[in-house]
Amino acid sequence: MLSPKRTKYRKAHKGRIHGTAKGGTSLNFGAYGLKAVEPMRVTARQIESARRAITRHLKRQGRVWIRIFPDLPVSTKPAEVRMGSGKGSPEFWAARVHPGRIMFEVDGVPLDLAKRAFELAAAKLPIKTRFITRLGEGGEA
């Protein structure tokens, strides 16, 4: 699973995901992509699960790029613990995904195969997504 090698701080503020993505909104590597439509936090496990769904459906042909990285430590407190006494310990890593952000890209495969692979990946993610191509959204290639 993806996680940073080292960070400046062990814990981070929860924060909010305001506005749209400033960068990473266009296809840079592949011919097809999966774009986020709503703001949400995506965990490293969810990213890995979606990646596996894509690579398994493509049967190792073509190339897959992951355009998001889980760099936010999410801390939780144990069950049935009283309020106070500090923040919990970091449990997992997540990526803040803004609307318009390209999350995955694929190249070297036919349109229908890429579309089905991204449908399978989207089912693994907690976020509404849209399939896009070099020419535009929806798959008019």
UniProtKB/Swiss-Prot annotation:
GO terms for molecular function: rRNA binding; structural constituent of ribosome; tRNA binding. Coiled coil: none annotated. GO terms for biological process: translation. The keyword Kinase does not apply. GO terms for cellular component: cytosolic large ribosomal subunit. Binds 23S rRNA and is also seen to make contacts with the A and possibly P site tRNAs. This is Large ribosomal subunit protein uL16. It comes from Rhodospirillum centenum (strain ATCC 51521 / SW).
